[in-house]
């Protein structure tokens, strides 16, 4: 029927915006004349809210049998915070299975799929009193919820620090993971991969899946084994000569071989300076005639332990054994400084976390609890995999070496540790740099830094890996160490709790009290009581919502720009002001937490539509 088709075309054009009203009219008439059983109306996905609105358009409101509107249902995993821990959280398949349920595809969505998707209900159609009636045979059961260990603040700053460096270095991919030392809870995990110049996204869980040759971070495990077996002490001298060492016809080189090498140094300094020659000589001295003993020692450290992770597709650490087809006379020395082994970044982090945790190797945790309707059904406790990876004496020696990798300052100024770029005046950091040449290309490298902070009372461990950078200095310290430093400083600063009772007021002047972004007139009433200046001195009556910038003694006020169809910036606002600003744009708001807004689900300046729901997190 062509009757009323003009009205339908008008409504479709106004709603879908992919054709004009005239274009829709011609398209619909063409389908009508073809007399096809199926004729696609709109080839893109629609939200359920939009679909419900379209069902009420002319023709379609008459129902399926007369109006002829049919739909294909699909589901999509909505991630309110974009790429944050996206690959770890996981995805679901778009197709809907029998019973109206979807299925986990990867990440935690796949691992906990049977708990998350619930159970479908069943009904039958029976004839009652001359009418057909639906009878529920089995009620559907809602799926459970999981509470992850991810800290949104730490995750956000970790991802930003990583992406900034990847863009600066034009690197192929990068990993950054932050773990809580005492529990093994993963507080942040970012896996970013270049999809086009300057743009990075989470496509693969590199932190768990990539079985990499770790390079010099592995020297810590080699040193731990040698110290534990009494092969050397931290003070033992070792001659690395000019930075080259020939063994079985191949040459082992230090990074400074071209400038003459380190000469005679101590065993501890071989870690500070990351000497390949030194660690190879130590391992050959102790294990050349019994390599099995060295391999057994590595197993005891837990660096290749089965972590039994919650995420499907996680890789496994691989350490060659004497007698393996790939074992050669060069395997032992090359293994000592991180080649001919494959270690996923999460394993390296768990090992370094154990060093920070007084020798206890913790299982990395991604899930805290299982919930139903907000109530915890099961709480996951921290799990110790190895109570003691080495003796306390060896542990203290290794901890001190890692501290000096970052913080040792040569009085002459020529031999600072390789981790100097990670040195911080805000928080004390201990760690180890890693630079590993990728076998497939002599020009490509994986650059890493792994460690913990603060050194005196470790709270967090962290690993950063930058893969295949095209720009910048090929150095684990310069590339990954600087990212580690930024993460550590920001995480530590956010954790500081000041003792206000010990602070004395400054007698000479009044300091600006904390003022949130938002409505300014209330703030002005408070600061006026403190006799604090404001600019401008007066606020127009119609100015209701404002951004502010509080300096030491002045409250600066300017009008909040709220544009139709554009997401405003509400970071830093209190709940009332954020809701006010968003609702002025015609948006709906979901809030979580208390305090100031720290995250908004749609970035400021991005296009939004009236009625769209925005999620904000306060802390």
Language-model segments: which ranges?
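Second-shell loop/turn segments in exported
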Residues: 1-2, 9-13, 36-45, 74, ...
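Acidic/histidine-enriched alpha-helical segments
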Residues: 21-34, 171-183, 238-242, 312-317, ...
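Beta-lactam-recognizing serine transpeptidase/beta-lactamase-like catalytic domain environment
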Residues: 125-137, 150, 174-215, 224-469, ...
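Conserved, well-ordered alpha-helix/loop/beta-strand core segments that scaffold catalytic motifs
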Residues: 131-174
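Small/polar-residue-rich segments within soluble enzyme cores
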Residues: 7-14, 23-141, 463-464, 482
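Ligand-recognition elements built from short beta-strands and adjacent flexible loops
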Residues: 319, 426, 486-619
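Short, well-structured beta-strand/strand-turn elements
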Residues: 64-70, 168, 586-596
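C-terminal, active-site-flanking charged/polar segments
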Residues: 454-462, 466-505
């Amino acid at each position: 029927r062509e009757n009323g088709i003009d009205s339908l075309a008008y409504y479709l054009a106004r709603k879908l915006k992919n054709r004009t009203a005239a274009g829709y009219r011609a398209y619909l008439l063409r389908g009508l004349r073809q007399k096809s059983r199926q004729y696609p109306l709109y080839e893109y996905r629609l939200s359920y809210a939009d679909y419900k609105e379209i069902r009420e358009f002319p023709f379609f409101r008459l129902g399926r049998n007369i109006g002829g509107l049919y739909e294909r249902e699909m589901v999509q995993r909505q991630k309110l915070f974009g790429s944050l821990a996206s690959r770890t959280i996981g995805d679901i398949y778009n197709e809907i299975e029998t019973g109206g349920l979807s299925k986990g595809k990867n990440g935690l969505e796949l691992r906990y799929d049977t708990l998350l998707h619930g159970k479908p209900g069943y009904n039958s159609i029976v004839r009652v009193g001359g009418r057909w009636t639906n009878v529920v045979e089995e009620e559907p059961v809602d799926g459970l919820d999981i509470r992850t260990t991810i800290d949104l603040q730490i995750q956000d700053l970790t991802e930003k620090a990583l992406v900034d460096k990847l863009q600066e270095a034009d690197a192929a991919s990068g990993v950054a993971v932050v773990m809580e030392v005492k529990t093994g809870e993963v507080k942040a995990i970012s896996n970013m991969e270049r999809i086009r110049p300057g743009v990075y996204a989470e496509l693969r869980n590199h932190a768990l899946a990539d079985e990499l040759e770790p390079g010099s971070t592995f020297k810590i495990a080699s040193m731990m084994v040698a110290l534990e077996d009494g092969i050397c002490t931290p003070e033992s001298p070792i001659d690395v000569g000019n930075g080259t060492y020939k063994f079985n016809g191949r040459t082992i080189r230090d990074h400074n071989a071209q400038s003459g090498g380190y000469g005679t140094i101590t065993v501890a300094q071989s870690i500070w300076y990351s000497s390949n020659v030194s660690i190879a000589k130590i391992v050959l001295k102790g294990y050349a005639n019994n390599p099995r003993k060295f391999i057994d020692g590595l197993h005891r450290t837990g660096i290749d332990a089965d972590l039994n992770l919650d995420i499907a597709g996680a890789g496994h650490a691989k350490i060659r054994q004497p007698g393996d087809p790939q074992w050669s006379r060069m395997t032992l020395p090359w293994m000592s400084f991180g080649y001919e082994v494959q270690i996923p970044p999460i394993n390296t982090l768990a090992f370094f976390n154990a060093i920070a945790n007084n020798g206890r190797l913790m299982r990395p945790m991604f899930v805290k609890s299982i919930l139903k309707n907000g109530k915890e059904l099961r709480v996951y406790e921290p799990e110790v995999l190895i109570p003691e990876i080495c003796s306390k004496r060896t542990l203290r020696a290794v901890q001190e070496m890692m501290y000096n990798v970052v913080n040792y300052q040569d009085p002459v100024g020529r031999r600072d540790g390789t981790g100097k770029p990670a040195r911080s005046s805000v928080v004390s950091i201990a760690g180890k740099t890693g630079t590993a040449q990728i076998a497939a290309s002599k020009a490509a490298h994986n650059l890493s830094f792994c460690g913990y902070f603060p050194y005196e009372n470790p709270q967090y461990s962290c690993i950063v890996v930058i893969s295949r950078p095209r720009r910048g200095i090929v150095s684990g310290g310069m590339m990954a160490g600087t990212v580690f430093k930024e993460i550590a400083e920001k995480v530590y600063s956010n954790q500081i709790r000041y003792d206000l009772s010990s602070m004395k007021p400054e007698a000479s002047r009044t300091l600006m009290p904390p003022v949130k972004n938002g409505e300014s007139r209330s703030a002005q009433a408070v600061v006026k009581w403190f006799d604090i200046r404001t600019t401008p001195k007066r606020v127009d009556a119609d100015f209701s919502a404002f951004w502010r910038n509080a300096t030491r003694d002045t409250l600066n006020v300017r009008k909040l720009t709220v544009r139709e169809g554009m997401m405003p910036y509400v970071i830093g606002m209190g709940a009332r002001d954020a809701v006010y600003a968003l609702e002025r744009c015609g948006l709906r708001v979901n809030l979580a937490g208390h305090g100031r807004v720290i995250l908004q689900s749609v970035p400021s300046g991005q296009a939004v539509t009236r009625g769209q729901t925005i999620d904000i997190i306060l802390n």
